[in-house]
């Protein structure tokens, strides 16, 4: 069907979001058209602000308004332990359980040769540099329990072991093929407590 150009552009824009197909994008576009102008302006401003006002922490790679982020700045954190996660949503999930007191390192992805993503395409080089400069005794690999997550964890483990840092993996209990961000707090808490050495 042919839509007016502004609607077509909006549908195309919504389809750039993960999980949004043509039908959902169309519904969102027409819902936006029905919204009050003030609400649309506020929505558009929120989209622009998230890109302009947020950055990535130069230490851990987590999203932040200030660099370094509040977690890296917190002197009460256990600086001898770093939990490596795939994305920012994983940090938020871990923080919700309020049990982990160490630092983080956000990779912004996982190794996926099928998608053309190698170790140099995610935040692994900065992790290795960080481990050389900081006094870290344990690295917790909290990748998602899927093929890409397992590959990434094994790759990092092989890189880090020669440095002499203990490398652990979250205990299973997380469903294979699932995403860390969707795990409940009890499951995450048990996974941290039961982590195993690699």
Curated annotation (Swiss-Prot):
Pfam entry (one): RecR_HhH
Keywords: DNA damage, DNA recombination, DNA repair, Metal-binding, Zinc, Zinc-finger
Protein name per Swiss-Prot or TrEMBL: Recombination protein RecR
Domain Toprim per the UniProt entry, residue ranges: 80-175
CDD domains: TOPRIM_recR (cd01025)
BP GO terms, sorted: double-strand break repair; recombinational repair
Span of zinc fingers (C4-type): 57-72
GO molecular function: DNA binding; zinc ion binding
Family that this chain belongs to: Belongs to the RecR family.
Job description of the protein: May play a role in DNA repair. It seems to be involved in an RecBC-independent recombinational process of DNA repair. It may act with RecF and RecO.
InterPro entries: DNA_Rcmb_RecR, Hlx-hairpin-Hlx_DNA-bd_motif, Rcmb_RecR, Rcmb_RecR_Znf, TOPRIM_dom, TOPRIM_RecR
Organism encoding this protein: Staphylococcus aureus (strain NCTC 8325 / PS 47)
């Amino acid at each position: 069907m042919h839509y007016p150009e502004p609607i077509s552009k909006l549908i195309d824009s919504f389809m750039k979001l993960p999980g949004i197909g043509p039908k959902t994008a169309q519904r969102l576009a027409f819902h936006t058209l029905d919204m009050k102008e003030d609400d649309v302006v506020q929505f558009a401003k929120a989209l622009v602000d998230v890109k302009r006002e947020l950055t990535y922490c130069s230490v851990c790679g987590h999203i932040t308004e200030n660099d370094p982020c509040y977690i890296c700045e917190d002197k009460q954190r256990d600086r001898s332990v770093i939990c490596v996660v795939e994305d920012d949503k994983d940090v938020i999930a871990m923080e919700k359980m309020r049990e982990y007191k160490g630092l983080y390192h956000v990779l912004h992805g996982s190794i996926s040769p099928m998608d053309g993503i190698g170790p140099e395409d995610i935040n692994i080089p900065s992790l290795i540099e960080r481990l050389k400069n900081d006094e870290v005794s344990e690295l917790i690999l909290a990748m998602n329990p899927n093929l890409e997550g397992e590959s990434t964890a094994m790759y990092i483990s092989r890189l880090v072991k020669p440095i002499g840092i203990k490398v652990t993996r979250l205990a299973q209990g997380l469903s294979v093929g699932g995403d860390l961000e969707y795990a409940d707090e009890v499951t995450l808490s048990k996974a941290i407590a039961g982590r195993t050495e690699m």
